[in-house]
UniProtKB/Swiss-Prot annotation:
This is Glycerol-3-phosphate dehydrogenase [NAD(P)+]. It catalyses: sn-glycerol 3-phosphate + NAD(+) = dihydroxyacetone phosphate + NADH + H(+); sn-glycerol 3-phosphate + NADP(+) = dihydroxyacetone phosphate + NADPH + H(+). NADPH binds at W11, R33, K107, A147, R262, V286, E288. Catalyzes the reduction of the glycolytic intermediate dihydroxyacetone phosphate (DHAP) to sn-glycerol 3-phosphate (G3P), the key precursor for phospholipid synthesis. Belongs to the NAD-dependent glycerol-3-phosphate dehydrogenase family. It is found in: Cytoplasm. It comes from Paracidovorax citrulli (strain AAC00-1) (Acidovorax citrulli).
Amino acid sequence: MKIIVFGAGAWGTAMALSAAAHPAGHAVTLWARDGRQADAMQAARQNARYLPGIAFPAALALASGAPSGALASCRADLAIVATPMSGLRGMLEELRDATIPVAWLCKGFEAVPAGGETAAQGLMAHEICSQVAPRLRAGALSGPSFALEAAQGRPTALVAASRDAHVRELLVEAFHGPTLRVYANEDIVGVEVGGAVKNVLAIATGLCDGLDLGTNARAALITRGLAEMSRLGLALGARAETFMGLSGLGDLVLTATGDLSRNRRVGLALARGLTLDQAVESLGHVAEGVYSARTVVRRAGQLGVDMPIAREVVALLDGRSTASDAVARLMGRSPAAELRSC
């Protein structure tokens, strides 16, 4: 199979490496928007910026330039979009006439700026695709995964999500191998809600750990956060069982507890007294939870879904609250039944 990965960040590079190492002998092209980055990776045969020290196999080619031109030149059977959420709309617009399946790796909602939004903001990835490239056969590859571990060939499990059975099957064929298990799921709404909400919740657990509130508090945040994720997903049309799977519980546990989690590290930084800008700058990478948190809370409000943890995260990010005030409000809420539908 011929595969092209658009986006040479950590995760795009990791997935290109995984595909290039597949026993089936895939021919893989890793595309970088910056031609200088592509040249540097070609010369060093590694991505020194995002995954230093991990060598590129001979089966991995490099490309840059116009995405449509790169797609045509490599004659790919499958295109993977590995941009952040902020770049997904533009990339799908460039690939809107592609005749091969396209899948994205980003997790989140389009960002809604403080104080407003436009009709082009606040959507999940599959909604963006339906809006700008409705003819694409498309899906998502998601689940609990840190780029470094996947690139190192450590055991990882992901979910190939699409309403199109052919897309699911092609993603499994492309990536399922000795170190990467890929499960198929037609519930793309549930998979994308899980991938978005877990980032917001990981900021909360980072704050919890940074404030040394204890493991009891962390367990409570993860569990009640999973309830918030499930309520929003069900209201958006997802299946309940999806949230007990890799893209729900699995991704939440990893992102909320793992030291490589960017969103958790934002929470840790805020707990140390850094401003949001300082916390984001210290990462050097995108933390999607910072940008999609407002959308999560807005869509929950539109649907009448109660998400108190996510709401407190947004108040903190917007500078309208402090961590201690957020804890006091969450603990001071009226008693409620553990299991409820909204």
